[in-house]
Structures are given as structure tokens and as C-alpha cells.
Amino acid sequence: MATIKIKQIGSPIRRPESQKKVLIGLGLGKMHRVVEVEDTPEVRGAIAKLPHMVAVVD
């Protein structure tokens, strides 16, 4: 299955708890970390919920 790389570009400080949980669910938590995850509709939805905190890296 295809994978995508996601980089955290925003801090979870002063963000709602639900956004923090989505960030942890993606495997992130600290600034400028990059993780490689499977490209599924669930992951795409999580990325869409946090456009101000994560970016897709080529």
C-alpha cells in the first residue's frame, strides 16, 4: 500500500484536546517530526482536520 510522509509544523499548545489526540494518533507530538504512514482515507481525514499543524512532505 502507498505511504505518505507527514511533518508537524504547528504546536499543540493552546489547542483543543481533540486536535491533540488526532496529532498523537498520526504518530506526531513534537515540532518538526516526520512520520511515514499508510495512505488511507482515515489518515487523509485526520490531515484535513489539522491543516494548520501538519503538512504532507514529498
From Swiss-Prot:
> Does the keyword field hold Magnesium?
no
Instruction: Look up the record and give one Gene Ontology term from the biological process aspect.
Output: translation
* InterPro entries named among the record's database cross-references: Ribo_uL30_ferredoxin-like_sf, Ribosomal_uL30_bac-type, Ribosomal_uL30_ferredoxin-like
Pfam families assigned to the protein according to its UniProt record, in alphabetical order: Ribosomal_L30
This entry's Gene Ontology molecular function terms read: structural constituent of ribosome
Q: Would you tell me the Gene Ontology cellular component terms? A: large ribosomal subunit
- CDD domains membership: Ribosomal_L30
Keywords, alphabetical: Ribonucleoprotein, Ribosomal protein
- Complex formation: Part of the 50S ribosomal subunit.
NCBIfam families recorded? rpmD_bact (TIGR01308)
Q: Which family does it belong to?
A: Belongs to the universal ribosomal protein uL30 family.
Entry protein name: Large ribosomal subunit protein uL30
Identify the species of origin: Novosphingobium aromaticivorans (strain ATCC 700278 / DSM 12444 / CCUG 56034 / CIP 105152 / NBRC 16084 / F199)
The gene from which this protein is expressed is: rpmD
